């Protein structure tokens, strides 16, 4: 998937670094469930017979990501929300589906939407979810990783030390060593700290996955034209559709 689905701007080393610290980031920044969600109202995608639950299980298995807590809110407007939440004193990635996806949608519609959003459960991408999809937050955390590796960042040390404590006090030693090793390789490869470009590439990857799962450009374009703009996204619906059209005629798509 990395070679033929992920965008070239999704730097391999940034991805690895964020993946190594994602569990600690998620634990640090997890929030209680919103009041309108009750744990007993979860939909179990392993046993629920509804189409949306079966499609969620299918997409989860195809992408090989962890199982999210799933809540269905058919009477409330909206598309999809992915929350970095806490349940039973542990991090529980939580996906909430609203009326735009639960009314009048078939398998192809659900395959696109679920594929597009469930790729965010991939640990490096989930790190960005935990950071509220803020490019500024992402930059601060990446510079914190550089600081921990004794690299110059140009940021105030006190601020970076505070972030470092929050993250690295939650990381096992093996993950710290992995992060340091990846950071060295990142620097040796002349990597760019333009993490905003990386964030945009992860968004593009989500749309590509959704398109591959539904295998219908018309359906993909229809959903993109109707979806609400996500926080942190710099792409217009036209940009997203153009990206998928170009991808659909690329060599990567046919491999």
Q: Would you name each region that the model predicts?
A:
Residues 96, 109-117:
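Short alpha-helical catalytic segment bearing the HExxH-like zincin motif
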């Amino acid at each position: 998937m990395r070679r033929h689905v992920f965008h070239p701007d999704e730097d391999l080393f940034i991805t690895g670094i964020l993946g190594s610290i994602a569990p600690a980031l998620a634990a640090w920044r997890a929030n209680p469930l919103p009041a309108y969600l009750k744990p007993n109202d979860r939909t179990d995608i392993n046993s629920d017979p509804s189409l949306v639950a079966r499609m969620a299980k299918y997409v989860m298995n195809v992408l090989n990501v962890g199982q999210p807590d799933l809540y269905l809110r058919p009477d409330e407007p909206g598309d999809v929300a992915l929350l970095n939440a806490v349940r039973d004193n542990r991090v529980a990635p939580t996906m909430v589906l609203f009326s735009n996806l639960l009314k009048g949608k078939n398998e192809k519609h659900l395959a696109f939407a679920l594929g597009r959003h469930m790729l965010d459960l991939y640990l490096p991408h989930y790190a960005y979810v935990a950071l509220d999809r803020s490019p500024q937050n992402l930059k601060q955390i990446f510079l914190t990783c550089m600081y921990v590796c004794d690299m110059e960042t140009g940021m105030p040390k006190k601020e970076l030390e505070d972030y470092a404590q929050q993250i690295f006090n939650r990381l096992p030693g093996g993950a710290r060593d992995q992060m340091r090793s990846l950071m060295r390789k990142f620097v040796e490869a002349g990597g760019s700290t333009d993490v905003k470009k990386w964030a945009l590439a992860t968004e593009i990857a989500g749309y590509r996955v959704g398109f591959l799962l539904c295998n219908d450009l018309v359906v993909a374009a229809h959903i993109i034209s109707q979806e609400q703009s996500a926080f942190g996204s710099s792409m217009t619906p036209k940009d997203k559709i153009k990206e998928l059209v170009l991808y659909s005629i690329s060599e990567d798509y046919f491999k």
